[in-house]
Amino acid sequence: MYDSTPAISTFVTGQGADRNSSQETRLENASDVADLKAGLLLSPKHIPCGYLYDDKGSQLYEEITKLDEYYPFKAEKDLLNQHAAEVVNSIPAGSILVELGCGTAEKTSVLLHALIARDGASNVHFLGIDVSMEALYMARTNVMKQCPQLSSKSIEMVCADYLEGLKQARARHPTAMLCVLWLGSSVGNLKPHEAVGFFQSVQESSGPNTQIFLCTDLWKDAKTLHAAYCDSQGVTEAFIKNGMTHALHAVGVGAQADPACWLYDVVINPVDRRVEMWLVANEDVKGVCDSVDIHKGERILMEMSRKFTLKDIRQLAFQSNFYVQDTWRNAKYSMQMFVSTSEAMQRCWKATDALFDGIGDWAIQPIDVRHPFGFYYGHLASFAKLKTMPRGEQSHMDEMYSRGIDPNMADPTKCHRHPDVPPEWPAKPQVQDYVQKVRMHILGAFASGSVTTRDAYIALEHEWMHLETLAYMLAQEQRLSFEKSSANSNNVQSSVSFDSSSDDEMSAKRERSHGHADSQGNGVTNGVANGNKHANGNSNGGLNGHTYANGVSHSISDSHINGNANSRSSNGHMPLQSASMIQIPAGDITLGIDTDPSKNFAWDNECPQQTPQHVSSFQIASRPISNAEYYKFAVECRGYEQEEYWKAEDLACLRKATKLCPATWTVQADGQVFVHRPGKSALLASVMQQAVWVSLAEAQAFCEWAGGRVMTEEEYERAAEHTRYNNSVLDLEHGGWEWTSTPFAPLKGFEAMSEYPEYSTDFFDGCHYVVKGSSPYTHASLIRRSFRNYYQKEYPYVFAKFRICKDTE
C-alpha cells in the first residue's frame, strides 16, 4: 500500500481520529516541510494530516463535531459519561491522570469530576502533554473552568511531544501510577506496526507503573462510516481541501491551491478496516517541490482513520507487551485499559488474594469432583511459575499443585492425567508461604525480561478462568451453608442474606461495559431492564406469573414458546410462555480465528480459522430461559422425575446426584425456593427474571419438555452475527455462558499448543460440550467471540444459561 503516517515524534492527530486532542504545531518550520516533501515523493502521494489544522481548519473541525453524521466525537463522549465511575474505579488512589494531546478538555473533565467525587479535589492531579503552548494554555483554562474545585497546583502542563512529555511526567512523579489517557481514537492515524512501536515507546518512556486508557473507534457498516467523513453539508470536504491549500502554501505554490482544483473522495477500505480521505487533481500542478508534479487525475491521500475490531485491539496490546485489563464499549466506540503484563499479573494476584481472604476454611470441598479450595491457591502459583519460567527448577510442591481434576461425571474413576492426590493437603500457612516465594521468583523473571508476552498471557488467562470457576465453588459453599443454617433455624431469614442486587449490578456492569443492549438500546441485566427487579409470585417462592423487561405482566402458562396459545408440544404438556421467537435467516459463518502466535494470543482450540460454512435458517428465543420458567418445569411439573425428557446417561447421573433442581437452588420442604450465588442467597421470587444456570443435560431436558432444542455452536455464531446491530437476541454473549449442543472437538487443522498441549486435547472426549459468551464473573480479557469454553454436559455447577431453539418449519 502506502506509507501515509508521519513519524511518531512529529505525530499530529487528525479528524479521522476525532480531534479531541491536538498535537498541533506550526508546520512551516524546516523539519515539517521536509516531512511534507517526503510525503509528496511517495506513490501514491500523501499530505501529513497536521496540515489540516491551521486556524481555518481548526474552526472547520469544530463544525464537524457538531454534525449529525459525525458520530465519533459524540460516541466517545457518551461512552465516558456512561462509564466514568467504572473507569475511575480502575484508577488507583494517588495516580496522576496524564492526557496525550490537549483540546477543549470537555471529555477529560468527565473523568476528572468522577475522580474528584471519589477522592476529593485535593487528591486529584492532572498533567497535560502537547507540543502546542497555545493548546496547553487553552486546556489549562478549560480544566480550571470545568473543574473549579481543582487548585492550580493540581494542574500541570508539559510542552513536548508525547514520548518526551511522558519522560518528563515520570521524572516529576517517579513513583506514582501514571494513568495515560489517549482520547479521540488518535491511534487510528497510525498503521498497525506504527501503533505497536508507539506503545512500546510509551512503556519505555513512562515505565512499568503505567496504565493506558485507549479510545478506539470500532469498525462498522460502510454507510455509517462514509456519511461520517462525507457529510451532506460538505464541511468535511472543505476541511480536507483547506488542508491541501495549507500544504501547497507551505511549499510555495499557493497560487495553485484553489479548492475548486480538487475533487474529494472518501474510500472505505474493508481489507485494512480504515476510512481514506483523498483529493483528486482536476488539473496539473507543476513544480510542487524538488521537480515533483501533481498530474491531472492523480490521487493524493490527505488522511486515514483506522477502525478497530476487538481482535485488532487485543493484537495491538499483545504485540506491545500490554494486557487488556478492562474494556468499556458501546455499539460504536470502545475504551480499553492497557497495563504491562507484569502489572497485569500483580493485579490478578490481588484479585486472587481477595477471593481467598474471604474463604474461611480452605479445606472445604463444596464440589466433590473438584479439589478443596486450598489446592487452587497453590495451583495458580504453580501453573504461573511453570509457564512463565518453563526452564526453571521444579520443586515437589510445584508438581503437586501443577494440575487439577475434571473426572468423568458418569464414572469419576476415569480422569485425565494429574498428580497423585496426597493423603493430606499442606496446611494453609504452608501454601501461603509457597505462593509468596513463587510470586517473588516470577516477578524477578519479569524484571529480567525473560518472561515472554505469550507465556504471561497463558498464565493470566488461566488464573482468570480459575477465579471464575472458584466462584462456582463459592456458590456451592453458600448453598451448603444456607441449608445447614436453615436446618438449624426456624427463622431462615435471620440467618442468611437475601440481597441479589450485587449480582445484578455485576451483570449489568459487564453487559453495559461490553455494549449489550435491548432493542430499545437500554442496558439489560439477565432479562431485567435497567437493573430493576420485578418480584411477583406467592410468598413461598412459587411463581404464579412474571413481569417481562417491558413491564408487561403475564401468567406463566398464558401462552407458549412456539407462539401458538392453542397448541401443545409433542409430549402433551403445555409449552411455556416466553419472549418471541426470532427467525435467523440462513447464511455463512466462519468458526475459529487465524492467529500468528508471535502477533496475538488465542488458545489452541480457537484456531485456525475455518472455511466459511452454511447454516440453515432456524428460530431462537429472544432471551434465555428464566428462573421462573425453569421453576415451572423443575418444581411444578416435576420434570426431574419424568424419564422421557432425559437421555439415559444423563438420567443415571441425575439419580446418583439425588438433586431434583439446579445445583444453585434450594427447594425446601415448605415450598420455599432459594437461588445461591457466591456469598449471598435470594428468594427465587426476587430473581425470577434472571436466566437460570444449569447443566447441558438439564437444558436439554427442559427443551425436550418444551418442544425445542439447544442450539449448536454454528447456530450461536450465526445468531450473534445476525443480531450484531439490531440486538434482537438478548443476553446472548453475557449474563451467563450459553450452552451449545456441539461436542468440544478440534477445529480442522488444529495443532496443540506446545506450552500447554493438554489444555484442549484431554477434553476432546465426547463428554465435554462447547459453551460460548461469558458470565458476570468472566474477566474482560476472556470475552471474545472466538473463545471456546467447555464443560461436561452433566456438570451442573457452571454459570451457563440456554434458550429454546427450533428448526424453521
Could you describe each region identified by the protein language model?
Residues 46-88:
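Class I SAM-dependent methyltransferase Rossmann-like catalytic core
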Residues 218, 224-306, 314-320:
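Substrate-binding/catalytic lobe of Class I Rossmann-like enzymes that use SAM or dcSAM, i.e.
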Residues 341-371, 378-379, 390-395, 399, ...:
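Disulfide-stabilized, aromatic/cysteine-rich ligand-recognition loop
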Residues 584, 620, 641, 691-692, ...:
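Conserved hydrophobic ligand-interaction patch in extracellular adhesion modules
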